[in-house]
């Protein structure tokens, strides 16, 4: 009898202990403000099927977070723990059910044994599909004088799975950069390798070629690429790049070109298609991109400064020239599409939307390498009206830089240092039929605060990909080190 009594007493004490330390909200005190969460997902717009927007609540002495998400068109889910960690399948089902609707998020936290409930906030589910498997990007550790650890990576946007495409641990001492697929289709994939084993890699339908890094007739490497929509051509700039360092606190690194030109490459014939209009003396042409119909080549150009001390006087305009894909020939004149120099600014990273309506670009004070320019901001040019405007709805006080469109032209991915001012993160925003953008959201992570606090990598040159990139990295590493290269020739 005594044994039974002791067991019963222990059970009562245990039950009282559980009641005294409840894991879910009870008698929560209302707080007249929304929660401070990381990442800031309050009021963002997301696509159906995106990875769960897990978040932490910022504040001292918070030992429990309870989050309930309710759909305006039905459905709900619940997370309870150290942070809001939602089930992937349940999240997908909820976003699918509420396409074009909204999610209401109720957040409670436990502090000092008491529960607090914040005001609800909304997450909007876009009516526009993402239509992409994921994103590709370069992830690079800080380093100024040598090529530190970096690699090209891909991330499934429906979950948290990341995989390396090619990592420079497999080719030590080499810099991997400037990758691009064709309208988000990785069956045509290109990137540049800089270093002692430099090359330009072009992969078409699984077949790789390593082009000589430099053609003596070009005077520089094949660097910034962009595919023709037909896949028959790839535009490049040829850059003699130099890196410098500022002594001003907010200005760290400067990247400039001693010279650069633009040309189109034909992979089938290994021919470089030049034109004197794109290789002008005393001018630098850079960052070429094709229009969605393939009949126009956009690029940026600036007057070179003979005195390198005057690098802040190098400012780029946006230009265009006609291109005939059937003949592989250019038009007979160049037009200035946007005069940034007249504004005292410099334009970089032009990216036309695939529906042909808009052109996204970055505006900075000088130069073209905007990643470290705190003043850099994104602009949108309406190709039908010629009007351009700063994207105030997505810009921040810190560097907002490189960007790309998804295939249906309703989503963009871009880099920004708005999080901490030091590291570039990936952000996504949707755009409607009138060119209006929604509040951006940061790339979701399973453990967001832990991931971004502990990460020493910046994300840059992001692009969408409609399927996983297939790339045999081990074979490719051997090919890089072998220095076997395919030569290129200038078309007569």
Task: Describe the residue ranges of each PLM region.
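Sequence signature of WD/YWTD-type beta-propeller architectures
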Residues: 21-492
């Amino acid at each position: 009898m005594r044994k039974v009594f002791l067991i019963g007493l222990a059970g009562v004490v245990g039950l009282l202990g559980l009641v005294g330390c409840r894991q879910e909200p009870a008698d929560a005190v209302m707080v007249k403000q929304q929660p401070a969460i990381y990442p800031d997902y309050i009021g963002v717009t997301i696509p159906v099927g995106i990875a769960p927007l897990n978040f932490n609540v910022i504040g001292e002495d918070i030992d429990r977070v309870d989050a309930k998400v309710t759909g305006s068109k039905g459905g709900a889910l619940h997370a309870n723990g150290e942070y809001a960690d939602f089930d992937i399948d349940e999240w997908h089902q909820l976003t699918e059910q509420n396409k074009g609707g909204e999610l209401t998020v109720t957040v409670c936290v436990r502090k000092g044994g008491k529960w607090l409930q914040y005001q609800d906030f909304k997450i909007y589910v876009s009516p526009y599909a993402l239509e992409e498997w994921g994103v590709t990007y370069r992830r690079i550790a800080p380093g100024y004088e040598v090529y530190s650890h970096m690699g090209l990576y891909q991330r499934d946007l429906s979950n948290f799975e990341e995989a390396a495409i090619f990592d420079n641990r497999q080719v030590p001492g080499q810099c991997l950069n400037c990758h691009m697929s064709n309208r988000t289709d990785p069956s045509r994939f290109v990137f540049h390798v800089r270093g002692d084993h430099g090359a330009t890699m072009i992969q078409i339908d699984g077949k790789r070629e390593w082009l000589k890094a430099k053609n003596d007739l070009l005077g520089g490497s094949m660097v910034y690429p962009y595919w023709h929509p037909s896949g028959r051509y790839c535009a490049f700039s040829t850059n003699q790049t130099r890196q410098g360092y500022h002594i001003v606190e907010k200005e760290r690194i400067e990247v400039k070109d001693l010279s650069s030109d633009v040309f189109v490459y034909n992979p089938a014939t290994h021919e470089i298609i030049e034109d004197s209009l794109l290789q002008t003396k005393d001018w630098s042409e850079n960052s070429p991109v094709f229009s969605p119909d393939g009949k126009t080549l956009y690029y940026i150009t600036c007057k070179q400064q003979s005195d390198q001390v005057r690098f802040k006087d190098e400012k780029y305009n946006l230009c265009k020239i006609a291109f005939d894909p059937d003949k592989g020939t250019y038009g007979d004149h160049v037009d200035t599409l946007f005069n940034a120099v007249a504004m005292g600014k410099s334009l970089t990273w032009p990216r036309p939307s695939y529906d042909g309506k808009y052109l996204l670009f970055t505006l900075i004070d000088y130069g073209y390498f905007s990643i470290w320019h705190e003043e850099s901001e994104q602009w949108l040019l309406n190709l039908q009206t010629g009007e351009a405007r700063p994207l105030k709805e997505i810009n921040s006080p810190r560097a907002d830089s490189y960007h790309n469109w998804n295939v249906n032209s309703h989503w963009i991915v871009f880099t920004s240092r708005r999080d901490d001012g030091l590291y570039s993160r990936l952000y996504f925003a949707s755009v409607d039929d009138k060119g209006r953008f929604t509040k951006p959201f940061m790339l979701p992570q399973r453990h967001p605060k832990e991931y971004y606090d502990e990460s020493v990598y910046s994300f840059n040159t992001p692009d969408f990909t409609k399927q996983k990139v297939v790339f045999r990295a081990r074979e490719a590493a051997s090919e890089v080190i072998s220095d076997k290269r395919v030569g290129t020739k200038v078309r007569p």
